[in-house]
């Protein structure tokens, strides 16, 4: 039988080759991968259809449905299921009349009936086998059948129908649809459209089927009316005037905060300071001849200087434009050539212009004004730098005008901005903005989205990307605050989320790419964020879910627009997870564009008859109608006529009757009502509720990673390569669904030079295959990349360049783009494996370079040829997200932690390897080397000798002789951390006898008010804050890493003379940083705090260390020996030298070094205590814990995995309130009078790790205990970025049982100081000093309350009912914890 069917199968395989399967736009993504959920409804046609015979009726219905499928899919070819179990392939070309289409459909139906019958499932299986596909091809998703045909949606195994039309009678048809894909509203609308279409063509069957209106009466109620008044004359005023009003009425209001990081201190600037500085800049520009409409170019970095420069330019009446120093000099020259600026401001922090740029300026521009090095000083003074032959700063002569307005009048049609977008001839286009748009929409946005002067906005957009304007202008319009991060805050994986939480950002503007940077490797929640506005690219449901997993209170607003529409955009709001947790579940994977903001319309216009709007579901071209459109392209009048079009839906002079009179000065700069549409070139559809979704481009312009790229611009540049004969660039999806730029190129085989770029292809690989081409032409491909790097921005260089003998053509002689797809991963792998051989010179790679190369190949979806160590990660297709993953992999494989900015700074294999070697310092590649573990010991000895004071006064008693009470002044660091705030509470909860305690709290903040608010927030989060604390807290601002904390001499002297007790609790806790990265924060800062005790009043010194300082084999053996001989563990008087060798983690090494140095200070007279806690866990009563805690992450990760590892051994887990009590008690202990004692914190009894994890099962979570090896393999194979353990994979998968082993500790001193404290103060003792099953239950309940764990099934025990207020829940995840058990591994 198979032999008989074979010819028919061959025929059918030909029929289905490269078939484009027709589909309709859906409303939902099915919840399950397999079945369908069938629903149906019947539709009645007008009575006249009842006289038509059923065969003709079937053809009419089929023709009408085929037309709608084409109009809704945007394709002119249809493939659908038809009667008698046949596949119908049909062309519905534009311009065809219905009567012609009916004839074509009749012929097509007869033709398919003439084909042999086929089993489509069998055909699919055969094609899968023949082409070695990973899936079963599908040939149809929709169909039209007759009444006799009982086909169901799930009729076939490999072809699940989405929609079937069944002709019931000549005047009635049934619509059977998958309700997992379509809403009843959409199906009802589709039925109305079919009826309307058939009715209209019945009356006029010679009409173009693409011109028949699909806007039904129901749709007209939700679609925009293109004839309404959009508030043409409602100018709100110029943005700089509104800013100036805020500055003059509320001068001291905080405007900009440049947040600090590391040794870079934070800077704050008021509205008055920025107003004064920008006035000086404006007066300078005017004095140098800058006039209204002149362009002033700003060479800038991210920061307050950019805002000052922008406002200065606007106040002068000029137009500002921004150049990013990251662009290649040749590209900068292109922008300068388009802008033709009359002025130039170079911001000092951006560096100097490249000589090639300076040469271009000298040869091509006539600048009236130039500020060579603008820099706003911390005290508000503004400097502009000095020009050649002048010794005076350019701005000094204008300082006296800082409070004087320029009074330059601008109007709604004056131009404030010049932004760049891609151009089709290789030259970018400059878009001139209008003042109208910069302010018109903010009042509505504030009301609609709840924005106010109390919000904190972020400055995260690319500095030369027009969304940066929204970052700056929104807060200054409202009188709000703008937060500016450091580049490392953006560049280091996970740190941007911490930055958001730390600084309490409430509103942010993001591109989807920046949103992914924000969430990638992030663990710190930031519940303060309430609005996130996304612009610039396609926003996915995954992007939203990831953001809301960290910011549960954020409502996400997807905004659709372009540089040309300025602020006139659409919006679609995704409510916050806290208000509607399941909202995202009902959305498709791409977030819709939504509907226009106030007085903005998205008009989806019929591409074949622009006098008609599209019906719901129909693909058309999107035009934006608004009064806030930009002016147009600078110097390109013909393109402006094509893109900015008078509204043809109203007659000329339609708005002449509006009364828009007035005598405001700005009316001199208004061109009157201009009802214009901007032709976006995007394709879109209306949804049933009137919202819009985007579905592609009408031309070859695309967006990738937030940047808009003209494919023609890329092709123009490639075509100029000497060995290129023919080329085309397309956007294709790789195997991971990521948009990828691919250029297909045919070389000039007639050029002899080509031979030098051709390599031999091994016999095992076919030369004509994709792998063969990549191998044969890899030298040519690399040369083309180098050619493009000099001409294009990095994001516009194609990820893949495929060299072909010829480009495929369709029958019309045009390039057949359907045959140019993303290469099969197996082909890329074969080429990559070949390039890994040493025959291509890879032996020249160092071992480290080869390891980096391997990591890149694992990450890059294109598996590129990396044959030189000078290859750039980003040229090969690397993105910011892939760079984030690379940082994680480097951390895992090479035990090196790099900021993401480092990967951008050193993008080649060679540069990155060199930087890794530099960061490692003296660490050798030889794994047997001990230098990495001896570095900290040698450094500790050196610091002790070089940095410690020669003598420290010994404190004998805190109580004067005979006194029953005395004031005591405690200096506490790390107060805003998890343990630190508990120490603060324990200090201030004590009665005033015998010690009346005042705490001098060290906090990093911009001012004392902000610092106290930080303290209050963290204490409130953990249920500790009392208003009575505030008068007893004195804030100390300063940097512990600087000598004398960088304080003025008097402030430092007052501390030295006033402080009685120092509790140094601050530390940088990091899972993988090497000692060198932690040295400043954990070692040198400790020395600086120690030296506070070197002069003035004698002081006690308590240092909060960690048992990580004892994590060596020596102490495990010492502990075992002590217990065997009847002791209790490592003695507290141990000399610490057992940790001078063998400590592996940088954190433990830094704590050991700090202890060593403190002991040396003790030998010089210092008195006090070293406190060594292990895992500091949450409060037993409330369960409130550090949300980023390693052990809590472990619980969450195990629940998600459904497995727990069976690990023996105990864990030294001690509740935070017990550790805090010990820190306080030890700081006042008489034992510290005679020596620098050690207080070990050891849980008695310790909980076993097995019992800790089994608590999940006890409380109802479905987990299975398995051997560690099995668990680790399951985690490694299933874990992704959503798993809480993802950032810690390198820890938990690397012999975790061994990592968890820790020595038992003697606690004689701990018992003594607690007993002494109780005797002295009669304070209520801490009862729970270790973690039991009940306490673990409170931690699990805490995770459940925060939403980190779902409701458990019924277990042996009910979850404890812990008390957490809504305020605590909102704050607890936002506070940054400086100490947690995350450090311990």
UniProtKB/Swiss-Prot annotation:
<comment type="similarity">
    <text>Belongs to the ATP-dependent AMP-binding enzyme family.</text>
</comment>
<dbReference type="Pfam" id="PF07993">
    <property type="entry name" value="NAD_binding_4"/>
</dbReference>
<keyword id="KW-0457">Lysine biosynthesis</keyword>
<keyword id="KW-0560">Oxidoreductase</keyword>
<dbReference type="InterPro" id="IPR009081">
    <property type="entry name" value="PP-bd_ACP"/>
</dbReference>
<dbReference type="Pfam" id="PF00550">
    <property type="entry name" value="PP-binding"/>
</dbReference>
<feature type="modified residue" description="O-(pantetheine 4'-phosphoryl)serine">
    <location>
        <position position="880"/>
    </location>
</feature>
<dbReference type="InterPro" id="IPR020845">
    <property type="entry name" value="AMP-binding_CS"/>
</dbReference>
<comment type="pathway">
    <text>Amino-acid biosynthesis; L-lysine biosynthesis via AAA pathway; L-lysine from L-alpha-aminoadipate (fungal route): step 1/3.</text>
</comment>
<dbReference type="InterPro" id="IPR036291">
    <property type="entry name" value="NAD(P)-bd_dom_sf"/>
</dbReference>
<dbReference type="InterPro" id="IPR036736">
    <property type="entry name" value="ACP-like_sf"/>
</dbReference>
<dbReference type="InterPro" id="IPR010080">
    <property type="entry name" value="Thioester_reductase-like_dom"/>
</dbReference>
<comment type="function">
    <text>Catalyzes the activation of alpha-aminoadipate by ATP-dependent adenylation and the reduction of activated alpha-aminoadipate by NADPH. The activated alpha-aminoadipate is bound to the phosphopantheinyl group of the enzyme itself before it is reduced to (S)-2-amino-6-oxohexanoate.</text>
</comment>
<dbReference type="InterPro" id="IPR045851">
    <property type="entry name" value="AMP-bd_C_sf"/>
</dbReference>
<keyword id="KW-0521">NADP</keyword>
<dbReference type="InterPro" id="IPR010071">
    <property type="entry name" value="AA_adenyl_dom"/>
</dbReference>
<dbReference type="InterPro" id="IPR013120">
    <property type="entry name" value="Far_NAD-bd"/>
</dbReference>
<dbReference type="Pfam" id="PF00501">
    <property type="entry name" value="AMP-binding"/>
</dbReference>
<dbReference type="InterPro" id="IPR014397">
    <property type="entry name" value="Lys2"/>
</dbReference>
<keyword id="KW-0597">Phosphoprotein</keyword>
<dbReference type="InterPro" id="IPR000873">
    <property type="entry name" value="AMP-dep_synth/lig_dom"/>
</dbReference>
<protein>
    <recommendedName>
        <fullName>L-2-aminoadipate reductase large subunit</fullName>
        <ecNumber>1.2.1.31</ecNumber>
        <ecNumber>1.2.1.95</ecNumber>
    </recommendedName>
</protein>
<keyword id="KW-0028">Amino-acid biosynthesis</keyword>
<comment type="subunit">
    <text>Heterodimer of an alpha and a beta subunit.</text>
</comment>
<dbReference type="InterPro" id="IPR042099">
    <property type="entry name" value="ANL_N_sf"/>
</dbReference>
<dbReference type="InterPro" id="IPR020806">
    <property type="entry name" value="PKS_PP-bd"/>
</dbReference>
<dbReference type="GO" id="GO:0004043">
    <property type="term" value="F:L-aminoadipate-semialdehyde dehydrogenase activity"/>
</dbReference>
<feature type="domain" description="Carrier">
    <location>
        <begin position="843"/>
        <end position="920"/>
    </location>
</feature>
<dbReference type="GO" id="GO:0031177">
    <property type="term" value="F:phosphopantetheine binding"/>
</dbReference>
<keyword id="KW-0596">Phosphopantetheine</keyword>
<dbReference type="GO" id="GO:0019878">
    <property type="term" value="P:lysine biosynthetic process via aminoadipic acid"/>
</dbReference>
């Amino acid at each position: 039988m198979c032999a008989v069917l074979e010819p028919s199968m061959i025929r059918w395989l030909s029929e289905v080759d490269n078939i484009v399967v027709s589909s309709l736009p859906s409303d939902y993504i099915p919840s399950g991968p397999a079945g369908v959920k069938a629903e149906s409804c019947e539709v009645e046609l007008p009575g006249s259809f009842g006289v038509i015979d059923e065969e003709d009726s079937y053809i009419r219905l089929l023709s009408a449905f085929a037309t709608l499928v084409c109009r809704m899919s945007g394709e002119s070819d249809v493939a659908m299921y038809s009667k008698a179990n046949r596949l119908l392939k049909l062309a519905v070309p534009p311009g065809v009349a219905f009567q012609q289409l009916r004839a074509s459909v009749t012929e097509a139906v007869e033709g398919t009936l003439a084909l042999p019958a086929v089993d489509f499932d069998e055909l699919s299986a055969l094609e899968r086998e023949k082409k070695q596909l990973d899936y079963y091809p599908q040939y149809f998703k929709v169909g039209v059948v007759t009444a006799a045909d009982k086909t169901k949606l799930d009729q076939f195994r490999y072809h699940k129908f989405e929609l079937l039309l069944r002709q019931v009678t000549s005047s009635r048809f049934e619509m059977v649809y998958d309700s997992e894909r379509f809403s009843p509203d959409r199906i009802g609308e589709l039925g109305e459209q079919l009826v309307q279409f058939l009715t209209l063509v019945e009356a006029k069957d010679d009409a173009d089927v693409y011109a028949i209106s699909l806007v039904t009466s129901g749709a007209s109620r939700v679609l925009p009316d293109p004839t309404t008044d959009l508030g043409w004359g409602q100018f709100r005023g110029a943005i700089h005037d509104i800013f100036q009003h805020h500055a003059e009425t509320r001068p001291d209001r905080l405007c900009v905060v440049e947040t600090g990081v590391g040794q870079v201190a934070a800077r704050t600037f008021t509205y008055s300071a920025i107003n004064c500085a920008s006035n000086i800049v404006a007066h300078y520009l005017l004095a140098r001849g800058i006039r209204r409409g002149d362009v002033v170019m700003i060479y800038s970095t991210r920061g307050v200087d950019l805002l000052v420069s922008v406002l200065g330019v606007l106040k002068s009446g000029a137009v500002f434009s921004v150049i990013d120093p990251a662009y290649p000099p040749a590209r900068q020259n292109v922008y300068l050539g388009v802008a033709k600026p009359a002025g130039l401001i170079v911001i000092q922090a951006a560096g100097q212009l490249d000589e090639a740029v300076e040469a271009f300026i000298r040869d091509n521009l006539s600048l009236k004004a130039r500020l060579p090095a603008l820099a706003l000083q911390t005290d508000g003074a503004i400097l502009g730098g000095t020009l050649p032959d002048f010794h005076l700063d350019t701005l000094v002569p204008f300082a006296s005008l800082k409070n004087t307005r320029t009074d330059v009048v601008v109007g709604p049609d004056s131009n404030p901005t010049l932004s760049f977008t891609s151009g089709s001839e290789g030259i970018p286009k400059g878009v001139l903005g209008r003042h109208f748009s910069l302010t018109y929409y903010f009042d509505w946005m504030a009301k609609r989205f709840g924005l106010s002067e109390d919000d904190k906005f972020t400055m995260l957009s690319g500095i030369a990307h027009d969304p940066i304007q929204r970052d700056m202008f929104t807060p200054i319009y409202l009188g709000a605050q703008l937060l500016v991060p450091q580049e490392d805050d953006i560049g280091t994986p996970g740190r941007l989320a911490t930055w958001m939480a730390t600084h309490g950002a409430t509103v942010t503007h993001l591109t989807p790419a920046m949103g992914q940077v924000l969430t990638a490797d992030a663990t710190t929640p930031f519940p303060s964020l309430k609005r996130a506005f996304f612009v610039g690219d396609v926003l996915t449901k995954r992007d939203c879910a990831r953001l809301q997993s960290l910011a549960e209170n954020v409502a996400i607003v997807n905004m659709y627009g372009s540089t040309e529409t300025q602020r006139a955009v659409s919006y679609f709001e995704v409510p916050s997870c806290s208000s509607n947790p399941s909202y995202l579940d009902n959305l498709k994977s791409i977030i819709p564009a939504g509907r226009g903001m106030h007085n903005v319309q998205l008009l989806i216009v019929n591409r074949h008859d622009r006098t008609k709007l599209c019906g719901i579901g129909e693909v058309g071209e999107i035009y934006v109608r608004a009064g806030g459109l930009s002016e147009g392209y600078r110097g390109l009048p013909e393109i402006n006529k094509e893109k900015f079009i008078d509204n043809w839906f109203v007659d000329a002079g339609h708005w002449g009757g509006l009364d828009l009179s007035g005598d405001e000065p700005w009316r001199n700069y208004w061109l009157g009502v201009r009802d214009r549409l901007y032709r976006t070139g995007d394709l879109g559809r209306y949804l049933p509720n009137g919202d819009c979704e985007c579905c592609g481009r009408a031309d070859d312009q695309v967006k990738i990673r937030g940047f808009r790229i003209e494919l023609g611009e890329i092709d123009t540049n490639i075509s100029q390569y000497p060995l290129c004969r023919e080329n085309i660039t397309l956007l294709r999806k790789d195997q991971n669904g990521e948009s990828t730029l691919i250029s297909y190129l045919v070389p000039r085989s007639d050029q002899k030079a080509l031979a030098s770029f051709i390599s031999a292809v091994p016999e095992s690989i076919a030369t004509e295959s994709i792998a063969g081409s990549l191998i044969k032409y890899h030298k040519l491909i690399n040369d083309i990349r180098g050619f493009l790097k000099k001409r294009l921005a990095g994001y516009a260089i194609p990820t893949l360049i495929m060299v072909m003998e010829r480009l495929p053509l369709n029958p019309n002689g045009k390039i057949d783009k359907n045959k140019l797809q993303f290469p099969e991963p197996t082909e890329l792998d074969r080429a990559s494996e070949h390039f890994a051989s040493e025959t291509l010179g890879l032996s020249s790679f160092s071992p480290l370079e080869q390891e980096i190369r391997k990591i890149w190949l694992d990450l890059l979806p294109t598996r590129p040829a990396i044959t030189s160590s000078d290859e750039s990660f980003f040229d090969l297709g690397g993105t910011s997200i892939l760079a984030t993953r690379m940082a994680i992999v480097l951390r895992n494989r090479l035990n090196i932690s790099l900021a993401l900015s480092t990967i951008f700074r050193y993008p080649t294999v060679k540069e990155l390897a060199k930087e890794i070697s530099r960061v490692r310092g003296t660490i050798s590649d030889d794994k047997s080397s001990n230098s990495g573990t001896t570095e900290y010991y040698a450094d500790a000895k050196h610091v002790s000798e070089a940095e410690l004071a020669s003598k420290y006064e010994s404190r004998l008693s805190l109580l004067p002789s005979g006194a029953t009470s005395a004031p005591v002044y405690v200096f506490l660091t790390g107060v805003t951390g998890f343990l630190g705030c508990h120490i603060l509470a324990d200090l201030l909860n004590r009665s005033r006898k015998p010690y009346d305690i005042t705490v001098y709290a060290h906090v990093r903040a911009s001012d004392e008010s902000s610092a106290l608010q930080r303290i209050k927030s963290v204490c409130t989060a953990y249920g500790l804050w009392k208003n009575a604390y505030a008068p007893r807290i004195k804030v100390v601002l300063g940097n512990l890493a600087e000598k004398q904390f960088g304080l003025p001499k008097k402030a430092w002297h007052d501390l030295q003379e006033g402080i009685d007790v120092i509790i140094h609790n601050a530390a940088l806790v990091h899972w993988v940083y090497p000692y060198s990265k932690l040295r400043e924060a954990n070692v040198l800062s400790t020395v600086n705090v120690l030296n506070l005790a070197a002069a003035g009043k004698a002081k006690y010194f308590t240092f909060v260390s960690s048992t990580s300082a004892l994590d060596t084999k020596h102490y495990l053996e010492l502990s075992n020996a002590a217990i065997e001989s009847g002791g209790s563990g490592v003695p507290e008087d141990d000399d610490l030298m057992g940790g001078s060798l063998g400590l592996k983690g940088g954190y433990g090494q830094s704590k050991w070094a700090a202890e060593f140095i403190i002991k040396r200070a003790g030998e010089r007279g210092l008195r006090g205590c070293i406190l060594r806690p292990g895992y500091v866990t949450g409060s037993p009563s409330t369960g409130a814990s550090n949300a980023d805690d390693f052990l809590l992450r472990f619980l969450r990760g195990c629940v998600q995995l459904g497995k727990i590892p069976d690990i023996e051994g105990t864990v030294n887990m001690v509740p935070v309130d017990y550790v805090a009590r010990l820190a306080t008690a030890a700081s006042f202990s008489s034992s510290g009078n005679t020596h620098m004692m050690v207080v070990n914190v050891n849980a008695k009894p310790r909980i076993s790790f097995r019992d800790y994890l089994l608590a999940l099962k006890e409380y109802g979570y479905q987990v299975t205990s398995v051997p560690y090896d099995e668990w680790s393999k399951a985690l490694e194979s299933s874990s992704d970025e959503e798993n809480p353990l993802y950032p810690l994979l390198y820890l938990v998968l690397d012999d975790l049982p061994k990592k968890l082993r820790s020595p038992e500790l003697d606690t004689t001193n701990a018992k003594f100081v607690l007993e002494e404290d109780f005797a002295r103060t009669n304070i209520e003792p801490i009862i729970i000093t270790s973690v039991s099953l009940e306490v673990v239950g409170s931690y699990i309940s805490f995770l459940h309350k925060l939403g980190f764990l779902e409701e458990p099934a019924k277990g042996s025990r009910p979850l404890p009912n812990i008390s957490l207020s809504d305020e605590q829940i909102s704050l607890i995840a936002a506070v940054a914890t400086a100490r947690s058990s995350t450090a311990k591994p």
